[in-house]
Amino acid sequence: MAKGSTIKIGLKCSECGDINYSTTKNAKTNTEKLELKKFSPRLNKHTIHKEVKLKS
């Protein structure tokens, strides 16, 4: 059985440093790091969240 090309990633808040969201992405088709504007519950506002690797 072949190993899948999807990896687990977390989305870390650039202001407070918390990892608030986790998701998966295809590492072969999306080579650049993901950067999304998401809600940070600690700061109670929308901030930039950047991709970090999670332990699988």
UniProtKB/Swiss-Prot annotation:
Protein's name according to its UniProt entry: Large ribosomal subunit protein bL33
InterPro entries from the UniProt entry: Ribosomal_bL33 (IPR001705), Ribosomal_bL33_CS (IPR018264), Ribosomal_bL33_sf (IPR038584), Ribosomal_zn-bd (IPR011332)
NCBIfam families named in the record: PRK00504.1, PRK00595.1, rpmG_bact
Position of the signal peptide: none
HAMAP family: Ribosomal_bL33 (MF_00294)
Single annotated GO MF: structural constituent of ribosome
Alphabetic keyword roster: Ribonucleoprotein, Ribosomal protein
Family: Belongs to the bacterial ribosomal protein bL33 family.
Domain of life of the source: Bacteria
